[in-house]
């Protein structure tokens, strides 16, 4: 005796159920979206490093979430057209995710800094202050970089890096590391304001995949690799 397989019922959302769902979760979704909007709007290194790190975590999580959703769409595609688009989107998302990791690893090899895995930019500005290398992300490689000392506090492009420095500690060169090459900026102007404050302007002078001589005698350290970073 053959048994007849009963097809599983197909569940569909009605308009009333969708409205009910939005009413129940509207407040929570609004709070979440407001939080994400504030983080994305005000998450800058020159304002708050803590908020900026949270912003980077949110941006970083976008990739795996996108890949998961596109794979889910492939498994539960409504029809062949949706399936085709879902497969294309999945392939594109995975390729871009792989490219991101490859570029980040290449930049990490060059700088040794975990900022290399920043999903927002592949530009890392680097300054050697008395043997201590500071590495921070910037959006683009500017033609000039400004380093400011305010009562011993060190700022570069408005980003606070450290304390206990004077204008005499500023190096002759700073660099911006990219995935494929290194940009060198030469100090072109320095102005002292009072006894403990002032600023220096660095101008882009050289671009290439090369190594700068170490500022630490006998260390064998290459400043282009920037291993001693914080």
From Swiss-Prot:
The keyword Chloroplast does not apply. It is a multi-pass membrane protein. Its main location: virion. The chain crosses the membrane at residues 25-45, 56-76, 85-105. It is found in: Virion membrane; Host Golgi apparatus membrane. GO terms for cellular component: host cell Golgi membrane; membrane; viral envelope; virion membrane. One of its GO terms (molecular function) is structural constituent of virion. InterPro entries: M_CoV, M_HCoV-like. The keyword Transmembrane applies. Belongs to the betacoronaviruses M protein family. This is Membrane protein. It comes from Bovine coronavirus (strain LY-138). The gene is M.
